[in-house]
Curated annotation (Swiss-Prot):
This is Substance-K receptor. One of its GO terms (biological process) is positive regulation of vascular permeability. The gene is TACR2. It is found in: Cell membrane. One of its GO terms (molecular function) is substance K receptor activity. Belongs to the G-protein coupled receptor 1 family.
Amino acid sequence: MGTCDIVTEANISSGPESNTTGITAFSMPSWQLALWATAYLALVLVAVTGNAIVIWIILAHRRMRTVTNYFIVNLALADLCMAAFNAAFNFVYASHNIWYFGRAFCYFQNLFPITAMFVSIYSMTAIAADRYMAIVHPFQPRLSAPSTKAVIAGIWLVALALASPQCFYSTVTMDQGATKCVVAWPEDSGGKTLLLYHLVVIALIYFLPLAVMFVAYSVIGLTLWRRAVPGHQAHGANLRHLQAMKKFVKTMVLVVLTFAICWLPYHLYFILGSFQEDIYCHKFIQQVYLALFWLAMSSTMYNPIIYCCLNHRFRSGFRLAFRCCPWVTPTKEDKLELTPTTSLSTRVNRCHTKETLFMAGDTAPSEATSGEAGRPQDGSGLWFGYGLLAPTKTHVEI
């Protein structure tokens, strides 16, 4: 980047940096800084609190410890770390254009938050793949507990490998009396190393996983939409089942679209900057970056909200987590939702419904592997738990 670069020298969240530095005189009024600080503080509080509660709901309740939910824990942990270690510190650096946090933390900021971002996206992709196998190929063997842990470990290792170049070339420099945390890329003609790394990273952390999730969820949606009980009209329980399937597809589309919308402007910002560096010389670019970075970081706080709004078990978990608040009153139903049940009739009687609901995600990963060979095992406590009672009839829990 050129000397007008205001926020990309430590581009802590996704990427590519320049091998030049420059002091920037950009500043903003105190009232404007206070507004941005309030917006970022609210983001961090919501994201950290929401994702911490999601992790607690799953790990503290045996009924929620399923294969898919372990991926959700991984996703929540990554989002929590990204909000706590990336959003706040990068906001301070972007708003002041001075690095206050030392050399060691400069290395850390160019490794761990980027790793967390990669883990977040890859965890979403793993969830999509798990849902694809559970719904499109329900009789294929499912992931065991050791396999799930191996996949999660693999995600972290790949993420660390992708983030390591930025950490390796990170350094702290002095630029006209101002301390900068920069990524000093090797000298090359025309900045090809920077551009190549930038394009590869964006492809791997955005376009590729987004394409995989789009294909997976499209096939899942088509499979659910076409799957119907033969010989019966859509009324009563069948109609409710059809409505549940539609809600399931809409939820998946919402998750993918939220991710895509939050991150697309941010990536376009850096793609444009790679080809037209003079855009960073405009005074308004500081406000543009702060807005785009807030939008990208806000993706870390939406998932807990989606879980709470669209899944009754997570909603019960959130009520239990906030039971100390005077306006939140958990019920016995909330506790029962997170307590393992021993019979299907108990669930049906408690819900006072004639519908037959089944959720194979009630078993933990270790228990799921001990079932019959070829038996469909669904590890979902979130995605409207799906399973088969018979080869000709499907059930979706809402």
